[in-house]
Structures are given as structure tokens and as C-alpha cells.
């Protein structure tokens, strides 16, 4: 069940929330058995929840929750700084220096900034040039400049938020890409050796502005690739303007922020969507029999140690294919005002306010 019903999009509602007729609307307001009950939903602006005094578990300490949806990162940070919000999700890295560090808490997330290479056509149809790009990137410089140190070096597709992953890798916790990375120095079994980039090899590097750090990363990443001999054209737009083109293979490389276990709680779903021959989110267009076999084996293995081993074997097969280059394991910076206790710091970004959360002013 956890691997099938972990996504908030797959929430199971109270029978009372469902309409009596086929054309009726689902209405979750006022229904539910959790510690808090949704009392008012204000579209995209916010929501109000009240403590459920009939809750079957530990009664919530807080009488309720007033939620405000604030898409602007600077505005979220300002709400914490001015003490107009008690808990703030996703404080932007650029705002960290303006806030009391005692109010900020970093949480490793199962989200990786990843460069997908188009294996269908163009320069990156050549595995040796994919390896050249892998060796050309400098993730430490990207993390220092763009994330201001608030991210982890990329050891693979799965980062430190998946704590069991590292010990099942041949290269453990060593950084995967880069000139001195595990792949370039022979520590990744089966990794392709980098080829020489032919003069004038032109590529288009695409990303999106919805996550500011990606837009900031693109020019630096372009410089790193150009130093290896690639001629890079940058194309950065809003996500909804590039997704269809990226999936259709219109770009040679696409930089994305990808959640690896968030939707299902299990990495197999992500690997299937992104890297199998039948994948629904295959920006690299990978068709690799070894990768397909490894993913299929992981999918067929029962949850537990053997499934974890199979997942890591699939990760290695994907990395060896060169279809994707991990660049940074992202962290979320959670803001908690003075007086807040018991807030959940959840790598899966599912739990935040619990029965134990309190605010004392």
C-alpha cells in the first residue's frame, strides 16, 4: 500500500465527501477523520482547518491552522522575517542571508537537479559524448554558486534523503559526475569513457524558470560544457512552454528538478517513467535493453532488502547509459518562527503540522 497510495493526489476521502450524483462535485470541506478538519477552502489563496476534537489519535495541541498559499519566495521569506507566519515552507536560498539562522531548518529531499541528455538523435546519441558531458560538469561549483552551499553533491540519482541507497552503490557516497568523479575515475562499473568533442558540436540546453535555481544554473552549466568543446545555445522558459518539446526530443539536453520517490514512495515508478523504453516522462528518449531489464526486475521484486538492491542495480544501469547526469541533491529550507515546537521536518514533504505542533508567543 505505501508504494501505491503515498501521493497526495491519491488521497482517500470520507464517503461523505463524494457527490450523490455522477455529475456532482467532490467536496472535502467538513469531512475527514484526521487531527484537523478542513473547514474552508479559498481556491488558490488559502485554507482554514480546525482541530478535530473527535480525532481517534492524540488530540492536536493547536486549535487550528490558517494556511496562506504564497507562490512568491521572497514574500514567503518576508512573512517569516516579520513574524506574520509561524511556519513557512520552501524559503528560497537567496533569502537565507536575510533571516535569523535560528529560524531556518534544512531538510534533505528526494529531489535531484538532473541533466537529461537526448539519446535519440544529435550529438548525445553517441555514448562517448554523453560521457564527455558527464565529465565536463562541476557540481561543486554549481552548488556553491547557485545553491550557496544549500544542496548536496550528487552521488547518483538517489540522494541522502534515501538513506539506504549509498551503501548499496559500488562507489558509496563519492560524487558521481565531474572530471574527478566516480564515473571518470573508474569506480562505476561499466561507465563509458569520455570521447573527444568534435569541433563545433552544437547543442541546445533547455530548462525552466518555475524553479529559480534552474534558471541560474543554466549559464554556469553552459560554460562548463563549452569548456569541454560543446557550443551551447540556452533556452529557458516557463515549464509549461517547454515540457511538450522536451518530451518530443526537441532539445539536446534538459535540466530539470526531479522528485525520485515523492509520488509513490518508491523509486521504481520514477525510473520506469523517465528511463524505460515505454516511459511516459522520457526526456532522454532512452531505449536500452539492460536498463529495461534492470527496472523490470526491480518492479517485480517484493518490498524489502532485495528490492532495494534491485533498485540500485537499475540506478547503476541508468547512470552507465549516460542518459542522465545528476547535478545536485536538493534540500528544502523550512522556516519556523520563534516559539514553534513540534513541526515536522519531513524529507518527503508530506507532514508539516502534526498533533504535537505548538506555537508559544
Stretches found by the model and what they are:
Residues 34-35, 63-64, 82, 110-155, ...:
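Alpha-helical secondary-structure segments
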Residues 46, 52-98:
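Ligand-site clamp/hinge motif
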Residues 149-193, 211-216:
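Structural transition elements
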Residues 191-260:
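Ligand/substrate-recognition segments at binding pockets and active sites
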Residues 233-234, 239-242, 272-337:
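Extracytoplasmic/peripheral linker and loop segments enriched in polar/acidic and small residues
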Residues 334-361:
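Long beta-strand-rich cores associated with HINT superfamily self-processing modules
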Amino acid at each position: 500500500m505505501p508504494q501505491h497510495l503515498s501521493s497526495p493526489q491519491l488521497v482517500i476521502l470520507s464517503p461523505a465527501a463524494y457527490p450523490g450524483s455522477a455529475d456532482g462535485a467532490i467536496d472535502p470541506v467538513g469531512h475527514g477523520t484526521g487531527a484537523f478538519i478542513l473547514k474552508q477552502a479559498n481556491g488558490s489563496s488559502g485554507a482554514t482547518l480546525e482541530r478535530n476534537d473527535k480525532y481517534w489519535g492524540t488530540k492536536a495541541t493547536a486549535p487550528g491552522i490558517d494556511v496562506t498559499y504564497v507562490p512568491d519566495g521572497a514574500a514567503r521569506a518576508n512573512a517569516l522575517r516579520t513574524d506574520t507566519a509561524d511556519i513557512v515552507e520552501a524559503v528560497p536560498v537567496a533569502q537565507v542571508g536575510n533571516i535569523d539562522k535560528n529560524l531556518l531548518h534544512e531538510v534533505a529531499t528526494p529531489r535531484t537537479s538532473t541533466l537529461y541528455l537526448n539519446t535519440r538523435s544529435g550529438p548525445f546519441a553517441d555514448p562517448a559524448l554523453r560521457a564527455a558531458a558527464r565529465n565536463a560538469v562541476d557540481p561543486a561549483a554549481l552548488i556553491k554558486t547557485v545553491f550557496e552551499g544549500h544542496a548536496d553533491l550528487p552521488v547518483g540519482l538517489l540522494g541522502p534523503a534515501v538513506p539506504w541507497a549509498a551503501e548499496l552503490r559500488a562507489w558509496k557516497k563519492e560524487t558521481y559526475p565531474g572530471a574527478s568523479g566516480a564515473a571518470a575515475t573508474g569506480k562505476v562499473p561499466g561507465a563509458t569513457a569520455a570521447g573527444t568533442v568534435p569541433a563545433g558540436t552544437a547543442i541546445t540546453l533547455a530548462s525552466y524558470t518555475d524553479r529559480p535555481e534552474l534558471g541560474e544554473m543554466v549559464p554556469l552549466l553552459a560554460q562548463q560544457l563549452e569548456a569541454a568543446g560543446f557550443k551551447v545555445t540556452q533556452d529557458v522558459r516557463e515549464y509549461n512552454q517547454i515540457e511538450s518539446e522536451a518530451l518530443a526530443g526537441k532539445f539536446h539536453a534538459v535540466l530539470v528538478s526531479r522528485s525520485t520517490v515523492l509520488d509513490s514512495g518508491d523509486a521504481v515508478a520514477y525510473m520506469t517513467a523517465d528511463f524505460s523504453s515505454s516511459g511516459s516522462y522520457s526526456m532522454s528518449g532512452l531505449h536500452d535493453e539492460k536498463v529495461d531489464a534492470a527496472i523490470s526486475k526491480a518492479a517485480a521484486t517484493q518490498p524489502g532488502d532485495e528490492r532495494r538492491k534491485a533498485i540500485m542495480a537499475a540506478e547503476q544501469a541508468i547512470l552507465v547509459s549516460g542518459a542522465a547526469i545528476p547535478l545536485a541533491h536538493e534540500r528544502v529550507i523550512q522556516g519556523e518562527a520563534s516559539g514553534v515546537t513540534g513541526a515536522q521536518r519531513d524529507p518527503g514533504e508530506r507532514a508539516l503540522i502534526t498533533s504535537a505542533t505548538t506555537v508559544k508567543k
